[in-house]
Amino acid sequence: KWEVGVDFKIGQVRGSVTYYEDKTRNGYMTSATFDTFKCVDYNQYSAAKPANETDMPELSLKSSDKILLQYSIPTNYFAYNSRGVEFDIDFGRINSIRTSFGLNGSWTQYKSWKNYYTFTNHTTGSSVAGSYPHMGVFEPGNKAEHSSSTTTNLRITHNIPRIGFVVTLTASVKWKEREYTTYGNDSIPVKYISRLDGQVYDFDASRIGEEEFQALDMRGRLDARRLIPESSMPPILCININLTKEIRNFMRISFFANNMFRSTPIWESKVYPGKYTRRNAKTFFFGAALSVKIR
């Protein structure tokens, strides 16, 4: 991670601007690996009816097959890139109206992906081979999550020193907010793990139509709309208020309300019409705080 910034002062206006970049290629996550797939025997037995109720039934091997079992372990395959600009400006206090103004905000871009192979298959029937097929191995980084946003926060603070009263109003605007996913080759594997011996083999894409590898073909199970990047959400406003009363020089009581107008608009996806997202859904809350100084 690295960042560079500048502080400035023009008259009573003070501020700072910072640009940063942050990246990692070995972040923590839990994931399956080639070593966490195990080929085991899958035995089915039939039971003969005992001669009497006190005897145990006699078991005989009915069938024996090979299947794959898997589990996940802690790994360092999480990767991301992040960059952005942050700013904070204090416009100072206008004494004639006993009010100060401040503005801060940020622009951010974020991308994350798994820096390792992914493992996927699907069942093709009720038989052992259909229920426990080979495991498809897909190329690293074939799915990446993206997000970006541009936000500003205007803070207005008005105080009346004579009665120890302070009102702070904050207007937060998300000018741009976007989340979408990009995909690489997530339909035909580049390798596979055999259910018969647990070994990893390179996969010849020309064999994807063979019955043995039907469970590795994801083309018919993926929605083509996933390849269309989602558009940005429109701007949204959230207003917060805080009222503080100072009682003498040892007590302070505050009342606050976040998203005071309960603005929670609904946004409809352009890629998946009929899919709605309620914005600002968890930002409305209010309360009171009491602080006492003990000297």
Which residues does each predicted region cover?
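Extracytoplasmic loops and strand-loop junctions of Gram-negative outer membrane beta-barrel proteins
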Residues: K1, K66-P74, S131-P140, R221-L227, ...
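Residues on the lipid-exposed face of transmembrane beta-strands in outer-membrane beta-barrel proteins
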Residues: V4-I10, V85-F91, T152-H158, A171, ...
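Gram-negative outer-membrane beta-barrel transporters
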Residues: Y45-G184
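Residues that define the transmembrane beta-barrel architecture of outer-membrane proteins
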Residues: W2, K9, A79-V85, H146-T152, ...
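Membrane-embedded beta-barrel scaffold of Gram-negative outer-membrane proteins
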Residues: K1-Q70
